[in-house]
């Protein structure tokens, strides 16, 4: 375990099991329907890469880069779109893939934007969910694990762009982010 972590919430094995189970459900839900998977950069990259390997249907991928943190541990509520999709999603089945759903402010903004583009359907898959933090009226259809309200890093999740490369997810020690 990394020295800056207080504990490990999800091991590599836990994460792979979540991807396998979620991938099977998504495969069943979208069988015989092409799917556009939209990863939210940067955090979702590792989860998306592992999840889409487990989805057995025709799919394409695209990415959006959106920020509401601006370097801290709390969402500012102000959503900035840094990179938009590269292709049209009109009349397509779209699955947003996110690393973590907390306040929901960011995902609510993204879903409203994508729905305005006349998609056929739009759902959310998230590895982690913190329902106690929810401020926006939004839920993910596919949830890997509900977790307590602690600041987590690893497997794509960061604190000031660090810890994304950890192959597991852990809780960051308070003294690390309170400096």
Swiss-Prot record:
The record, for InterPro entries, names: HGPRT, Hxn_phspho_trans, PRibTrfase_dom, PRTase-like
Annotated GO biological processes are: GMP salvage; guanine salvage; hypoxanthine metabolic process; IMP salvage; purine ribonucleoside salvage
Which residues are GMP-binding?
130, 151-152, 158
According to the lineage, what is the superkingdom? Bacteria
Could you tell me the keywords of this UniProt record? Answer: Cytoplasm, Glycosyltransferase, Magnesium, Metal-binding, Nucleotide-binding, Purine salvage, Transferase
Q: Where in the cell is it found?
A: Cytoplasm
- Coiled-coil-forming residues are none
Fetch the CDD domains from UniProt: PRTases_typeI
Q: Which SUPFAM superfamilies match?
A: PRTase-like
Question: What's its top-level EC category?
Answer: transferase
Principal location listed in the UniProt entry: cytoplasm
Q: In which pathway does it act?
A: Purine metabolism; IMP biosynthesis via salvage pathway; IMP from hypoxanthine: step 1/1; Purine metabolism; GMP biosynthesis via salvage pathway; GMP from guanine: step 1/1
Q: What is its EC number?
A: 2.4.2.8
GO cellular component terms given for this protein: cytosol
Residues the entry annotates as binding Mg(2+): 98-99
Binding positions for diphosphate per the UniProt entry: 42-43, 164
Q: Identify the catalytic residues.
A: 102
Write down the required cofactor(s).
Answer: Mg(2+)
Question: What's this protein's family per the entry?
Answer: Belongs to the purine/pyrimidine phosphoribosyltransferase family.
Q: Give a short account of what the protein does.
A: Purine salvage pathway enzyme that catalyzes the transfer of the ribosyl-5-phosphate group from 5-phospho-alpha-D-ribose 1-diphosphate (PRPP) to the N9 position of the 6-oxopurines hypoxanthine and guanine to form the corresponding ribonucleotides IMP (inosine 5'-monophosphate) and GMP (guanosine 5'-monophosphate), with the release of PPi.
Q: Which NCBIfam families match?
A: HGPRTase
- Protein's recorded name: Hypoxanthine-guanine phosphoribosyltransferase
Per the UniProt record, the source organism is: Staphylococcus epidermidis (strain ATCC 35984 / DSM 28319 / BCRC 17069 / CCUG 31568 / BM 3577 / RP62A)
